[in-house]
């Protein structure tokens, strides 16, 4: 890749070695011939810009500076105490011990670890964490995401499917270009709030949450690294300097402006006219020259090799850089008209593998019948920030005055129409062959997955709270009971707990299987146990789950601590601790059931792939009046069925409902 300016290299010397390597691979010669330099934010991230953000912020009359105002006050991620972690581990392992001897072996392994390598690794981790506000950040980003080689779709990215707009907004909802205009215009308003730093800090239960993800949300992309590095990178650009989005249509990409030359957001009419032009251009162009997005569906090592080939040509290079620099991507899937929850979920999750650019951090989707959704690349952002964004977008769309909005769309606001620009790529025979291979691999990979949506309308959070339980903990019990009914055993179960109360916090594992959950599912399936005792076991298990999840959110889980300790091992250490090599230790974190909750009254779908090919991925939402789980697995690999789990989820939810209602009636008669 060409170096654009000699000053860049001197700036790079001030960066850490790993950052220099990543940044060096990203320095480019833009078609605009404007030099870009790495600038460090207050959060320690680096973005590429002609001028630092402060230059633009000082010129914004509405700049407030509140979005990131609490960042320096956030606590650093703590290193848990070793004894506490080992004690918690023993509690979580007990349900998987079939006899006393097995559990006693785990106790001996923990004792050996606590007396030998454990304290050494703990001291190393504390020393490593001493000058870092988040000791896990680099390890987690690289090892959990950037070094992961499987295709990021379907295996890493996650999606939201938006509910249809109310009937009185059908003029907007049923016209895909009008709907796309509304989405783009609304997201631009959100971007303006980011530029003004007027977005309020998220406060959860009185605690400010880390807002770092919002500085990394727009004008960013995952980037294939060098083949020899076996690792991807992330690249970030100034949110103030790149006022355009990328539109995907019929497998091609177009640059669509969102602001005028004075940094003023374009009108709805100017956005709509550009979208109309994209569709017109797309219908006239040669489809054989598209399909570049398919390459982002490849395993990462294959994509890195093809990426090198693409970057040899300056035309393709400029087009890729434009996509990376764009605020976000909007995919027009005008040949798709999903109706069922499963159809909508699949289109948002993976689509056709052609009309996407999976490396792009944010992709909104609009289909031919106006159905909309969202796909997120996961490496630098977890779900809560993008949930916030999508909630905002859907909320604003639901508030639109249809007549006023349609008038804005059809009324020209400028005599000079902005013209979108198709992003050209030079497709050599080698690249063409890679595109064909990518599309074949994509179809095969997606074909291995089953997806079924469990949307349960009998009750929701209102009913659960009335019976004194946390809705999240309750649905975890429904899942445990359904799995136990289906497979006659419990499986290691993961629930994501947010640690955003800490600086650059992401997630910790909530272990859903416990002695309490084993007692609950065992008693529930035992016909000799009285209903009152079953309900007591249910409530006790739910309470225990809430306690564990609270500890996890406070940074005091088990799994991230073990992850950190493993990273403290050195090549000259005598041996790997026996605990880390133990089959049961490793089985306990083999997430055969992976779960996570992100809920919105504006979504009718949310999901992602299973974490382990032998298990299920269960993404769930909780509404006041309904429950929703997106069920995904690989049936041929796992030998399990999404349809059967769907059945047992309904059976479990029905039985618990009947038991709670009947117990209430019994008590009322006393």
From Swiss-Prot:
Record Pfam families: Carn_acyltransf
Matching InterPro entries: Carn_acyl_trans (IPR000542), CAT-like_dom_sf (IPR023213), Cho/carn_acyl_trans (IPR039551), Cho/carn_acyl_trans_2 (IPR042231)
Enzyme Commission code: 2.3.1.7
Induction of expression: By ethanol. Repressed by galactose.
Catalytic activity: (R)-carnitine + acetyl-CoA = O-acetyl-(R)-carnitine + CoA
Gene3D superfamilies assigned: Chloramphenicol acetyltransferase-like domain, Choline/Carnitine o-acyltransferase, domain 2
Sites where the protein binds (R)-carnitine: 494, 507
Matching SUPFAM superfamilies: CoA-dependent acyltransferases
Keywords: Acyltransferase, Fatty acid metabolism, Lipid metabolism, Membrane, Mitochondrion, Mitochondrion inner membrane, Peroxisome, Transferase, Transit peptide, Transport
GO biological process per UniProt: carnitine metabolic process; fatty acid metabolic process
Domain of life, source organism: Eukaryota
Catalytic class of the enzyme: transferase
Disulfide bonding pattern of the chain: none
Catalytic site: 378 (proton acceptor)
Biological role stated in the UniProt entry: Carnitine acetylase is specific for short chain fatty acids. Carnitine acetylase seems to affect the flux through the pyruvate dehydrogenase complex. It may be involved as well in the transport of acetyl-CoA into mitochondria.
Family of this protein: Belongs to the carnitine/choline acetyltransferase family.
Note: Present with 450 molecules/cell in log phase SD medium.
PANTHER family attached to this UniProt entry: CARNITINE O-ACETYL-TRANSFERASE, ISOFORM A-RELATED (PTHR22589:SF103), CARNITINE O-ACYLTRANSFERASE (PTHR22589)
Name this protein carries in UniProt: Carnitine O-acetyltransferase, mitochondrial
Highest classification ranks of the organism: Eukaryota, Fungi, Dikarya, Ascomycota, Saccharomycotina
């Amino acid at each position: 890749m060409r170096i654009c300016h000699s000053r860049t290299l001197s700036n790079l010397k001030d960066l850490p070695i790993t950052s220099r390597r990543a940044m060096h691979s990203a320095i480019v010669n833009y078609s605009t011939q404007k030099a870009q330099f790495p600038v460090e934010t207050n959060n320690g991230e680096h973005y590429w810009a002609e001028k630092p953000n402060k230059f633009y912020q000082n010129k914004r009359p509405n700049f407030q500076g509140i979005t990131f105002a609490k960042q320096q006050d956030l606590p650093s991620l703590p290193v848990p105490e070793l004894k506490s972690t080992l004690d918690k581990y023993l509690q979580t392992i007990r349900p998987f011990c079939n006899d006393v001897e097995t559990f006693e072996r785990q106790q001996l392994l923990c004792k050996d670890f606590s007396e030998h390598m454990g304290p050494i690794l703990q001291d190393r981790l504390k020393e490593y964490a001493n000058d870092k506000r988040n000791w896990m950040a680099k390890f987690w980003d690289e090892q959990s995401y950037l070094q992961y080689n499987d295709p990021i779709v379907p295996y890493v990215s996650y999606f939201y499917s938006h509910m249809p707009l109310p009937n009185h907004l059908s003029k907007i909802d049923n016209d895909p270009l009008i709907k796309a205009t509304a989405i783009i215009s609304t997201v631009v308003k959100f971007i303006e709030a980011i530029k003004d730093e007027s977005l309020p800090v998220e406060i959860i239960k009185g605690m400010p949450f880390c807002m770092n993800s919002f500085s990394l949300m727009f004008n960013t992309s995952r980037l294939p690294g060098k083949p020899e590095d076996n690792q991807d990178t992330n690249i970030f650009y100034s949110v103030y300097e790149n006022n355009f989005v990328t539109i995907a249509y019929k497998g091609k990409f177009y640059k669509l402006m969102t602001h005028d030359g004075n940094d003023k957001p374009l009108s709805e009419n100017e956005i709509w006219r550009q979208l109309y032009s994209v569709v017109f251009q797309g219908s006239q162009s040669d489809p054989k020259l598209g399909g570049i997005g398919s390459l982002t569906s490849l395993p990462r090592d294959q994509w890195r090799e093809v990426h090198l080939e693409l970057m040899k040509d300056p035309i393709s290079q400029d087009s890729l850089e434009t996509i990376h620099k764009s605020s976000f991507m909007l995919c027009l899937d005008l040949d798709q008209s999903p109706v069922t929850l499963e159809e909508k979920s699949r289109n948002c999750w993976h689509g056709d593998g052609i009309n996407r650019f999976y490396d792009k951090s944010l992709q909104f989707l609009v289909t031919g019948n106006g159905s909309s959704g969202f796909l997120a690349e996961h490496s630098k952002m977890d779900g809560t920030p993008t949930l916030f964004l999508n909630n905002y977008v859907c909320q604003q769309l639901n508030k639109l005055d249809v007549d006023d909005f349609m008038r804005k769309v059809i009324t020209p606001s400028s005599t000079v129409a902005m013209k979108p620009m198709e992003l050209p790529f030079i497709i050599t025979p080698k690249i063409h062959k890679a595109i064909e291979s990518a599309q074949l691999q994509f179809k095969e990979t997606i074909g291995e997955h089953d997806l079924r949506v469990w949307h349960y309308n009998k009750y929701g959070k209102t009913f659960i709270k009335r019976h004194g339980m946390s809705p999240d903990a309750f649905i975890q019990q429904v899942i445990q009971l359904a799995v136990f009914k289906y497979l006659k055993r419990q499986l290691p179960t993961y629930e994501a707990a947010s640690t955003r109360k800490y600086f650059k916090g992401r997630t910790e594992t909530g272990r859903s299987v416990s002695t309490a959950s084993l007692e609950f599912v065992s008693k529930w399936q035992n016909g000799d146990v009285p209903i009152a005792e079953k309900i007591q076991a249910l409530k006790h298990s739910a309470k225990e789950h809430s306690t564990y999840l609270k500890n996890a959110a406070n940074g005091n889980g088990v799994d991230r601590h073990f992850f950190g300790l493993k990273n403290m091992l050195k090549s000259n250490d005598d041996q790997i601790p026996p605990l880390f090599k133990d089959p049961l230790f490793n089985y306990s974190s083999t997430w055969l059931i992976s779960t996570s909750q992100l809920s919105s009254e504006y979504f009718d779908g949310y999901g992602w792939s299973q974490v382990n090919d032998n298990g299920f991925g269960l993404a769930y939402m909780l509404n006041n009046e309904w429950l929703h789980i997106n069920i995904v697995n690989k049936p041929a690999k796992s030998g399990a069925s999404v349809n059967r789990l769907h059945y047992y989820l309904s059976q479990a939810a029905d039985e618990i409902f009947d038991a709670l209602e009947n117990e209430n009636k019994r008590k009322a008669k006393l």
